[in-house]
Amino acid sequence: RDLDFSSAFALSALPHYQHLVREIGATKMQSYLDNADYGNRSMGGGVDQFWIAGNLRITPRQQLEFLRRLHRSELPFRDTVMGQVRQIMQRTERGGNVFGKTGWAISAEGLHTGWSIGWLARDRKEPLYFATLLQTTEPGDSFLDIRLLLSLEALDQVESQH
């Protein structure tokens, strides 16, 4: 079905992203990765697979730095585009001041990797950035929700100490 970018983001609609990167093309996509200094910048594995089953790798620390740069509009993209991405990332948790994305991948060996990245916007304070990474071979029923819940619990603990 046809989705706008906001809906595709919320649903992690892989076919939408694959169509988008095919439209962008490999050369331009590689330029985006290079200019944004995103992870190891590798597109090995194909233009519509490099971030799924290909060679692109990014550490939690690299993700945090990327989020900081997005939040501060320091990425090499138009300010309007970065603003739209931030708006799409805004979640309803905690009064709508959490911005983030979750993901889940399963390796060929059956390892489930779940993550939650983002930031908590705070009045007149520097945001709290977070990256939560979980791995298991037996994810259970709660794996979908636990990625963000653990992040929010950790943020609550940090907030209570400040």
Describe the function of each predicted region.
Residues A13-H16, T59-Q62, T113, R147:
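Catalytic-loop motifs flanking and including active-site residues across diverse enzymes
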Residues F5-S12:
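Short helix- or helix-capping micro-motifs
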Residues S12, V47, L134-T136:
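Short, histidine-centered active-site or binding-site loop motifs used for metal coordination
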Residues A8, Q63, F130:
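Active-site SXXK
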Residues R22-G25, R69-H162:
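Structured C-terminal helix/loop/strand segments within mature extracytoplasmic catalytic/sensor domains
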Residues R1, F5, Y17-R72:
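Mid-domain, small-residue-enriched loop/turn segments at the edges of structured enzyme/sensor domains
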